[in-house]
Regions:
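Anion (oxyanion) recognition and catalysis
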Residues: 2, 6, 105
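Hydrophobic, well-ordered secondary-structure segments
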Residues: 1-2, 11
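Histidine-acidic metal/acid-base catalytic patches
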Residues: 24-151
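Aromatic-lined carbohydrate-recognition surfaces of secreted/lumenal glycan-active proteins
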Residues: 10-23, 46
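Residue-level signal for beta-strand positions within conserved beta-sheet cores that form or flank
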Residues: 8-10, 111
């Protein structure tokens, strides 16, 4: 990855994923692994729906990544199954979305936060409401983190 980044001048941010299960076993769907934290990637994308599906500790992950965090996919998940990546609106699952957003803002994160919520089952009005709710959630918690930031 480092060579590709250097040669292209692009930032390649590898995303955290989750283990795939088949029957009682797991399938190695991602190489070298679904968890980018111990890998030597310079830049990582963190998806909170994926931390739910993987049953990973999102706050431990963001602390471990530190300055390697380059991009965020903001969503939530229940973590009730490792078979379904839910992409719930933030605040509707079991992930610490509020704490996560406040932490990255307070820490000086300068990358993008992209909403990645599932709206396929919604009509236009429902979709707009879910997106507005998610955007307000993100803005509120990023602002709270910024307010605590040391000048």
């Amino acid at each position: 990855m480092a060579t590709r980044e250097h040669d292209s001048g692009l930032c390649v941010a590898v995303e955290n994923m989750f283990p795939w299960t088949a029957g009682r076993g797991t399938v190695q769907a991602y190489l070298p692994h679904w968890d980018p934290v111990p890998q030597p990637y310079d830049h990582v994308t963190m998806d909170l729906s994926h931390t739910a599906t993987a049953r990973s500790d999102a706050m431990a992950m963001v602390h471990a990544l530190g300055d390697r965090l380059a991009h965020v996919h903001l969503a939530d998940g229940s973590g009730s199954t490792t078979l379904k990546d839910e992409h719930l609106p933030p605040g509707r699952g079991n992930q610490p979305c509020a704490e996560f957003l406040e932490h990255i803002a307070e820490s000086g994160y300068t990358g993008a936060v992209a909403l990645e919520v599932g709206t396929r089952r919604q009509d236009r009005t429902g979709r707009e409401a879910v997106l507005a709710e998610s955007l307000a959630f993100a803005r509120d918690h990023l602002a709270a983190g910024l307010a605590r930031r040391e000048p």
